[in-house]
Amino acid sequence: MTMPSTQFHTTILEQFSLFLSVDRGLCQQSIAAYRQDISSFLTISAISSPQDISQNSVYIFAEELYRRKEAETTLARRLIALKVFFLFLKDQQLLPYPPIIEHPKIWKRLPSVLTPQEVDALLAVPLQMEKNPRHLAFRDTAILHTLYSTGVRVSELCDLRLGHVSDDCIRVTGKGSKTRLVPLGSRAREAIDAYLCPFRDQYQKKNPHEDHLFLSTRGHKLERSCVWRRIHNYAKQVTSKPVSPHSLRHAFATHLLDNKADLRVIQEMLGHARIASTEVYTHVAADSLIEKFLAHHPRNL
């Protein structure tokens, strides 16, 4: 008896999610993204069992994505998810001969990096804004300093707990639940101390058992969306570049490379599983070097 397509979708997506969590060690956010992509594939290509999956079903899916004029990066992400899904089906002996996935060629965009001067200006903004309440100014200054000093992802920042912070380093839990120690600069440590007492103490009175480092004014763990929104607003005061919390991670890595830091050390601090993810910053640093050369070489003046 053939299983109804909706029941098949639900069952196979649950099994796939378990595979991503246990075998691949992915976080819930990544698993949700994979589920969404595969759910789209199953629906668009009218898949009601593994036997329905063929090269043609992949073409149907890809054509629909092209018809929707999805961005190249989105298209590539969906096809990568499809490739992982097929590997899962093969591993479960549900699809012995998976279709071939051809990835579209993508121009890998280099991140637009803040200069050290722009970072310094950004770090100073919260305390300079007259209408910014002092408790928010000190909290947000500590957030900005921590992001730039350590290069952590905004999700990792929000997950930091009081016990994860010492005088000269922080303990970070990154992708795949992997833990790493990252040095904490003295200016960042000073900014955190200035926030902890009295401002964080005031927040915690509303929620005494909360032990996350960065709290909302109601005493709860700070949400990533809040960090993104506040940094975006601060950045508008000092630069026309698009700035997000990840911009400070880019700046952290690029400025370290500019100052001759070892690429492998940067890889460890960023929590990259592959060195290729870190190598993108060598291209950013090289572009910066070329710009300086063109600006200062006598033949170009």
UniProtKB/Swiss-Prot annotation:
One Gene Ontology CC term in the entry: cytoplasm
Gene Ontology molecular function terms on file: DNA binding; tyrosine-based site-specific recombinase activity
Occurrences of domain Core-binding (CB) (ranges): 7-90
Keywords of this entry: Cell cycle, Cell division, Chromosome partition, Cytoplasm, DNA integration, DNA recombination, DNA-binding
GO BP term (any one): cell division
InterPro entries assigned to the protein according to its UniProt record, in alphabetical order: CB, DNA_brk_join_enz, Integrase-like_cat_sf, Integrase_catalytic, Integrase_recombinase_N, Integrase_SAM-like_N, Recomb_XerD, Tyrosine_recombinase_XerC/XerD
Pfam families named in the record: Phage_int_SAM_1, Phage_integrase
Localization terms from the record: Cytoplasm
Domain Tyr recombinase: 109-294
Keyword Cytoplasm applies: yes
Quaternary organization: Forms a cyclic heterotetrameric complex composed of two molecules of XerC and two molecules of XerD.
Main function: Site-specific tyrosine recombinase, which acts by catalyzing the cutting and rejoining of the recombining DNA molecules. The XerC-XerD complex is essential to convert dimers of the bacterial chromosome into monomers to permit their segregation at cell division. It also contributes to the segregational stability of plasmids.
NCBIfam families from the UniProt entry: PRK00283.1 (NF001399)
PANTHER family xrefs: PHAGE INTEGRASE-RELATED, TYROSINE RECOMBINASE XERC
Protein name (database record): Tyrosine recombinase XerD
Organism lineage string: Bacteria, Pseudomonadati, Chlamydiota, Chlamydiia, Chlamydiales
